[in-house]
Amino acid sequence: MGAGQAGYPGYVFEWQSRLAHNLYVSMVMTSQNFKVIATGLEFPEGPIAMKDGSILLVEIKRGTLTRVLPTGEQEIVAELGGGPNGIAIGPGGQCYVCNNGGFDWHTDTAGNRPTLQPASYSGGRIEVVDLDTGSVEVLYTEVNGVSLSGPNDIVFDAQGGFYFSDLGKVRRHDQDRGRVLYAKADGSFIKTLAAPVEMPNGVGLSPDESILYVAETPTARLWAFDLIEPGRVQKQPWPSPHGGRFILGSSGYQRFDSLAVEENGQVCVATLVNGGISIVSPEVGSVEHISFPDPYTTNICFGGDGLRTAYITLSQSGQLIEVPWPRAGLALNYLNK
């Protein structure tokens, strides 16, 4: 073990050996490195650092869009029902929501954990919330006559369109195949970009918006889709299963969740089981891992001065935490760009 490292003050490092073509570095975070902003959240996800200092997020189990103030006080912005999962600010300042339709839940002393499609499943959908009034509009429920089953994460491009993942739903004896889609913010156009994708979760754009990154949950793989233009992918030939370029896969059992991109182009992937944030350098295929005390570390966003503060959801324990970050996050369209 070694303490400190250039750019990572206060972190404790444990170096691991080179595995195949990837260099895995484990960084164990000590308690003084993060601040708990809010507790008692019902499986928080999808944080957005707003300009007023508040954090907008969803509570999947509670079915709400929630605002967390810097004091930790929580306000319900909208009652959405189902399973609001990922959010993004779009043109006009409205909040676009990926709603997966709901989960069954397992609750124990560690907190909440989503499981199967529930009897109360309300269908997958993209919703739009007016942040001033809390009014909710359903924008999309299907693509080419096929229902959305479990929309998960979302990112806007500079042209006003958005990419989102449809992870699908898992039932006791079968499950849906996932896909990645592109749609316009006004509800006029939606298309499938890649399918089948194995439970696609986090999505994010490279700084120049020429690459769409997609994280698969059960495989713990990160894929890159090269974009010819907004909503159009230059697909890789077989044996790529869906046209994406393989960037990185886990060397052990863990699962990938949502992601955010740094200003320098590195991809920060929330990692389950081995709870933490895996920081991937796409050009060299290396990864660093920062651990947090929750196996359901599900999402990360950037805010604060120079976008050098990370806000991370520890979902099983119901916490939102704040972490000083060694590099700047990427500014997002319609939010802070």
Predicted features along the sequence, with ranges:
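Extreme N-terminal basic, low-complexity initiation segments
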Residues: 2-9
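Sequence-structural signature of mature extracellular/luminal beta-sheet repeat domains
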Residues: 25-337
